């Protein structure tokens, strides 16, 4: 099954490092880097507001466990956001391409 994984990162440098590693290692077929994200969250009892970037990672359920570990190894956050969402439907040719380029 195909998935979109959401990952927030603190900088463009970190975004590019993670994106390139995932695609080069065939853990993802494509990664979109979306700038201009404002995140408001609770951390260590305080409400924090940060500027971040969002990675939209296209991968498969099979590749996700290795992808998650690779992101954790590259990510500067203690508890990085790594959330996988299933793709219910999509362009069949795109989903075929995604599977062919992951794993």
From Swiss-Prot:
Any Pfam family hit: CutA1
Name this protein carries in UniProt: Divalent-cation tolerance protein CutA
Main location: cytoplasm
UniProt keyword terms in alphabetical order: Cytoplasm
GO cellular component entries: cytoplasm
Family: Belongs to the CutA family.
Organism whose genome encodes this protein: Thermus thermophilus (strain ATCC 27634 / DSM 579 / HB8)
Annotated function: Involved in resistance toward heavy metals.
GO molecular function: copper ion binding
Binding partners and assembly: Homotrimer.
Kinase is among the record's keywords: no
InterPro entries assigned to the protein according to its UniProt record, in alphabetical order: Ion_tolerance_CutA, N-reg_PII-like_a/b, N-reg_PII/ATP_PRibTrfase_C
Gene Ontology biological process terms in this record: response to metal ion
Gene3D superfamilies (alphabetical): 3.30.70.120
Annotated TM spans: none
PANTHER family according to UniProt: DIVALENT CATION TOLERANCE CUTA-RELATED (PTHR23419), FI09726P (PTHR23419:SF8)
Keyword Nucleotide-binding: no
Source species taxonomy: Bacteria, Thermotogati, Deinococcota, Deinococci, Thermales
Subcellular compartments: Cytoplasm
